[in-house]
């Protein structure tokens, strides 16, 4: 049973205005200093792991109380996650670290339905959270013998005075008609309930980025882990689980040529993935992170509609901002291109759009209605097979067998009897109009309404509720 802790952050808050401080996220002129004090409701011996599965943080922002509900991101790593560095003679040095007791969380702010939070508790609290439409960050202060943290708005981070940074994808580059037309489709709410998909990510860090962080592989690894945690959070809106499968740091030299031409570098990386990477590692989509400054202020590039293709399921992203969340948005943006999305136009609706061509002064964290339609069209028309398997459990790769009560690769439902009104026994696919075939939140081939109780609690525990977008009964993150 998940042990839920109530952790109260008792804050001594000191606003600093006019003075300046340098944090990992950049230079700040306005921030609040807070001193967290952890108070646990359970005896220390009752907590089996170093990091709890579910937590709550209570503290104040701008003098107002805030309660943050957090749940550990169980989908952050695939079951075969590995890290590889390279020796001076280019030999691979592999490691398979234990990542079950990791320190990365997702969450929300109580009484704010539109809030989001992504947090690392590895070395103090490092997080971003959105409340009332504004993005805040919290980071530890490097003050001797204290637990001081800084809380600040994203807008208070000093911005570089430079030309706008942008994606290198053009609307007519490697695109196809079905996704161009997708933003014009009228998609009903029922059609927008996306089937769950799983993307295993392989992240490669080039030698320039390794040098940028003074050869500190541990720092780079933590930075990448936090970025994937952010990507995972943003992709939840599309019911996509993104899990890190491979992290490679080119600590000695680049294994391909990375230059100022983003198209050239991307082409070389794609060819290398096809001929080398796929023979070594299991993954669905690979991204190369680099410190190289590309021509034309480009910070990323990816083929449109390339997901699962051996050469085109790739992206390149420049590590262009000290705030790792901003870089994670760029990584999500480029992966969005691989999933059939184009850049947002004026007619697209979202608060701050992930798929905007130019990096906004305001942090982007939402897919637009156009993106949702384009993604829906892409997975329907092209059915990328590699993202069907759940990387958190061993994949089943045998030939589909009717009625074995196990969804295998390529199946949408367990075939079973030809009389099943939801599942076509000949194809193991859902019948037209069906959203599901079985599950506690499936009723007459349709997802049950969000908020419907699907598992009644026992004792002092809490009920589980349907989420309206899947047939399974998700576990309530606030179980006792």
Swiss-Prot record:
Cofactor: Zn(2+)
Keyword terms: Cell adhesion impairing toxin, Disulfide bond, Glycoprotein, Hemostasis impairing toxin, Hydrolase, Metal-binding, Metalloprotease, Platelet aggregation inhibiting toxin, Protease, Secreted, Signal, Toxin, Zinc, Zymogen
Signal peptide annotation: 1-20
Any Pfam family: Reprolysin
Cofactor: how and how many bound: Binds 1 zinc ion per subunit.
GO MF, any single term: metalloendopeptidase activity
InterPro entries (UniProt xref): Disintegrin_CS, Disintegrin_dom, Disintegrin_dom_sf, MetalloPept_cat_dom_sf, Peptidase_M12B, Peptidase_M12B_N, Reprolysin_adamalysin
Positions bearing carbohydrate: 259, 279
Active-site residues, Swiss-Prot/TrEMBL: 334
Residue ranges of the propeptide: 21-190
Domain Peptidase M12B, first and last residues per copy: 197-391
EC category name: hydrolase
Positions with a binding annotation for Zn(2+): 333, 337, 343
Tissue specificity field: Expressed by the venom gland.
Family note: Belongs to the venom metalloproteinase (M12B) family. P-II subfamily. P-IIa sub-subfamily.
PANTHER family: ADAM A DISINTEGRIN AND METALLOPROTEASE DOMAIN, DISINTEGRIN AND METALLOPROTEINASE DOMAIN-CONTAINING PROTEIN 28
Misc. comment: The disintegrin belongs to the medium disintegrin subfamily.
Protein name, UniProt field: Zinc metalloproteinase/disintegrin
Organismal lineage: Eukaryota, Metazoa, Chordata, Craniata, Vertebrata
